[in-house]
Amino acid sequence: MSHVSVIAARLLVWVGILLCLGVPQLWANPIYLYEPSANKSTRAPQVLGVPPEVYAFTVSCKACWLP
């Protein structure tokens, strides 16, 4: 495999892991979407184990994963 495809494969694996961690957590705790930004930015890494930017991205992607 070329160097680019290896990077792309690793990126897809990480995105899949983050979505698996983040989407069920958002379904279980939708209140996090409505908390003040200061509170959400401090709680997101504790809840998901990911940076707030990734948490915000997962929040924005929630709608496309709903059945």
Swiss-Prot record:
Signal sequence range: 1-28
Protein's UniProt keywords contain Glycoprotein: yes
Highest taxon of the lineage: Viruses
Keywords: Glycoprotein, Signal
Glycosylation (residues): 39
Name this polypeptide is given: Uncharacterized protein 122R
Originating organism: Invertebrate iridescent virus 3
Lineage: Viruses, Varidnaviria, Bamfordvirae, Nucleocytoviricota, Megaviricetes
